[in-house]
A protein has these predicted regions:
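Secondary-structure transition/capping motifs at alpha-helix termini
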Residues: 47-55, 76-86, 110-117, 252-258
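Generic long, charged, amphipathic alpha-helical segments
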Residues: 227, 235, 246-262
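Hydrophobic, small-residue-rich alpha-helical packing segments that form membrane-like cores
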Residues: 1-80
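Flexible loop/turn segments at secondary-structure boundaries
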Residues: 32-36, 63-67, 93-97, 126-131, ...
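Polyanionic/metal-chelating signatures
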Residues: 1-3, 81-83, 91-227
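Divalent metal-coordination and catalytic microenvironments
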Residues: 21, 59, 121, 182, ...
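Acidic, glycine-enriched loop/beta-strand segments at the rims
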Residues: 200-212, 253-263, 270-274
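Short, well-structured alpha-helical segments that form the helix of a local strand-helix-strand
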Residues: 187-193, 258-266
């Protein structure tokens, strides 16, 4: 937690950014170093973007068993700072959390109905794209309990997308590497990070298609992605998000009309960043 002087320096940097044309404040509360931030710290910073009509965008603290609490935290930051809120990549991760999308959407809609300018974005896949190190630090591979801010994924559900220094591992699953190393899963991941690279990108399955569709249909949901197109087997959201929406969810499944899909991919995004 920053002291008063450190928080003031952070605020000044934020103001400098807003004066230079930035659109708001973004946090990644499952990643280093954002995972150590507390709500009061973020509220004080978010207050600095209010006069610029900035937006607070958050990759929330917990997208699994703590999903509801994280939505409340995110919304309260917006309320306390009097700023717009966007939830990044709304999802409910881990089989024990499948079905929570309905409760999550009801809660977000209530905040919206009560006057908070809040919405969310989503990518149309059941696998997330992230750093292997982040999954390890968030207890994804500790199967003794359901506690993990990023949800649980089994070794066969984690695909290695980019492996610096060992391209032959790209396209393999953690289960493949675990068999190669003949080690328990956590030791396998640690060996990969220590001996090969600590910058391994993965695609980790863990969401349910019904939740994806429920979130997609909501009037507050925008479609977008920040996927990283590196490695020989990158997560397809880096280039396939919009084609997948049109082919799978408009043409094949009819989850969205063409007009609604285009609105979610264009006008809604622009309106949120005005």
């Amino acid at each position: 937690v920053p002291n008063k002087n450190e928080l003031e320096k952070m605020a000044n940097l934020l103001i400098e950014g807003m004066e230079s044309g930035c659109l708001g404040l973004s946090t990644g509360l499952v990643y280093e170093p954002g995972r150590y931030s507390v709500s009061n710290e973020i509220i004080e910073l978010a207050k600095k973007i209010q006069k610029y009509d900035g937006v607070y965008v958050s990759h929330m603290r917990n997208e699994a068993e703590g999903l509801i609490e994280s939505i409340i935290e995110t919304a309260n930051i917006g309320l306390e700072a009097n700023v717009k809120v966007e939830i990044s990549h709304l999802k409910s991760v881990g089989k024990s959390n499948w079905g929570k999308s309905e409760q999550a959407l009801d809660l977000i809609e209530k905040f919206s109905d009560d006057g908070l300018d809040i919405n969310m974005d989503q990518y149309p896949y059941t696998a997330r794209s992230t750093m292997l190190k982040a999954l390890l630090l968030n207890d994804t591979f500790n199967y003794e309990n359901d506690l993990s801010p990023m949800g649980k994924s089994m070794p066969n559900e984690v695909l290695l997308c980019s492996v610096p220094n060992e391209k032959s591992f790209e396209g393999k699953t953690l289960e493949d590497i675990q068999k190669l190393y003949d080690l328990p899963i956590i030791e396998t991941v640690n060996k990969l990070l220590d001996d090969v690279s600590d910058k391994i990108l993965v695609a980790a399955f863990g969401m349910n298609e019904n939740d994806v569709q429920n979130i997609m249909k909501n009037d507050l949901t925008m479609i977008g992605t920040d996927g990283i197109d590196v490695g020989s087997k990158p997560h397809p959201r880096a280039w396939g998000t919009y084609p997948r929406i049109l082919e799978e969810y408009v043409d094949r499944l009819g989850i969205l009309t063409l007009e609604n899909a285009i609105n979610k991919m264009t006008h809604m995004l622009l309106r949120n960043l005005e």
